[in-house]
């Protein structure tokens, strides 16, 4: 039997949500399966899913077993991989199996070293095999990546020019954190992994022949709280800006710099004013700093941080939300002397909290782009959501109930 989508790591916190969503929305249109190490856990999950999923195939797949990975990749259009925590020591064999079989791959990682290593090792091979490898396909980094892409695309269509700058801002967000995400980030901070230096380079995920721009920080010129002239709001650094900014800059490079060759890109979280911005920045810095030192790290793990597999309550996920707003500034003035601006928004509407329920939706719709609308996607390579999918992803997310639009 062949499958359109195989959900790998289906019994994890976000994997379960993805299976629920796939059963309710996409399962009737595509043959899909759930995969993982423990068939007993998979069977228990299947019993908890809606009636439409009662006949879904279960596959025993261990990410450490090369033959099992190759076997499932050979009979699948796209593997949707949630077997991370962290991805950098579990997902590369999955990417390799997909590339060797011409199978597409989707995940929700925000691990810059892993994404850089994946691109270095497999981009050329994936292009040759016509395998589309898509990382960071959840809240990290679809909203910012697609908002920037929509704004830059509209700038060219409306005003015939590239952008001098794009600023993304998380205008509103509410949700919780799962243990898997926290421990994945902890691994990036505390372990010596390949390409860790890419986290410190604003252009660390660009292709080898990429053209560096003016950015020196994830906020563009600074990571400190600041009044942003484009957003016309106070911004502080976003915890997700490290992978998200590098994803957007990689999108621009992969597409041939349609956003602008000298583009300045940055992002942040909207705050009421400078005081709240500094307090938020200091709190974030304290938390990150505490994770570096063994005694405080042990205390946080013991009494504060959730374990892998744990996450927000169902109520918190249902009530969660987010809005991301991109403002693009044209590279030159028009005949009237005015420099044009374009505003694009990504709104979760009723998709749920950003990190989990909405991430499940976005990652499944990304996988369905590859499974059901492959002809509208990029041919292959280690891509980004914007560079690999573009308008097809915008269309699917809008059809799924989110709202992605460019303001008139």
Locate predicted features.
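N-terminal Rossmann NAD(P)H-binding glycine-rich loop of SDR-like oxidoreductase domains
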Residues: 3-25
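Conserved glycine-rich Rossmann-like NAD(P)H-binding loop of the short-chain dehydrogenase/reductase
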Residues: 27-41
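Rossmann-fold cofactor-recognition segment
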Residues: 49-65
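Conserved Rossmann-fold cofactor-binding substructure of NAD(P)-dependent oxidoreductases
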Residues: 60-78, 85-89
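ADP-ribose/adenylate-binding Rossmann-like module
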Residues: 85, 97-115
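Rossmann-fold NAD(P)-binding glycine/threonine-rich loop
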Residues: 109-131
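Adenosine-phosphate binding glycine-rich loop
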Residues: 125, 129-173
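C-terminal catalytic/substrate-binding lobe primarily of soluble NAD(P)-dependent oxidoreductases
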Residues: 153-408
């Amino acid at each position: 039997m062949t499958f359109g989508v195989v959900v790998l790591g289906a019994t994890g916190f976000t994997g379960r949500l993805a299976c629920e969503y796939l059963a309710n929305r996409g399962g009737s249109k595509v043959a899909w399966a759930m995969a993982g190490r423990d068939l007993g856990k998979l069977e228990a999950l299947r019993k908890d899913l809606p009636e439409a999923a009662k006949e879904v195939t279960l596959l025993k797949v261990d990410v450490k077993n090369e033959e099992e990975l190759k076997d499932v990749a050979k009979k699948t259009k796209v593997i949707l991989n949630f077997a991370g925590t962290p991805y950098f020591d579990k997902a590369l064999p999955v990417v390799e199996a997909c590339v060797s079989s011409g199978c597409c791959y989707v995940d929700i990682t925000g691990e810059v070293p892993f994404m850089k290593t994946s691109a270095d090792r497999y981009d050329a091979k994936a292009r040759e095999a016509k395998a589309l490898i898509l990382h960071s396909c959840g809240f990290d980094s679809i909203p910012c990546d697609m908002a920037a892409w929509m704004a830059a695309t509209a700038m060219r269509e409306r005003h015939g020019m590239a952008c001098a700058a794009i600023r993304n801002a998380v205008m509103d967000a509410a949700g919780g954190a799962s243990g898997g995400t926290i421990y994945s980030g902890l691994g990036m901070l505390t372990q010596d992994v390949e390409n860790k230096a890419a986290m410190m380079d604003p252009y660390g995920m660009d292709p080898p022949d990429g053209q560096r721009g003016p950015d020196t920080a994830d906020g563009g010129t600074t990571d400190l709280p600041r009044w942003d002239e484009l957003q016309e709001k106070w911004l502080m650094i976003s915890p997700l800006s490290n992978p998200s900014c590098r994803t957007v800059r990689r999108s621009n490079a992969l597409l041939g710099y349609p956003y602008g060759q000298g583009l300045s890109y940055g992002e942040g979280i909207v705050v009421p004013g400078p005081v709240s911005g500094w307090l938020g920045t200091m709190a974030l810095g304290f938390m990150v700093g505490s994770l570096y030192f063994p005694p405080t790290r042990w205390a946080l793990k013991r009494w504060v941080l959730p374990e892998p597999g744990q996450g927000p309550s169902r109520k918190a996920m249902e009530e969660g939300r987010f809005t991301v707003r991109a403002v693009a500034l044209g590279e030159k003035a028009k005949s009237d002397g005015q420099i044009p601006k374009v505003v694009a928004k990504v709104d979760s509407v009723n998709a749920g909290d950003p990190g989990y329920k909405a991430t499940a939706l976005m990652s499944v719709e990304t996988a369905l782009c590859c499974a059901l609308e492959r002809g509208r996607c990029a041919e292959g390579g280690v891509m980004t959501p914007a560079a690999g999918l573009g308008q097809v992803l915008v269309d699917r997310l809008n059809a799924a109930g989110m709202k992605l639009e460019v303001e008139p």
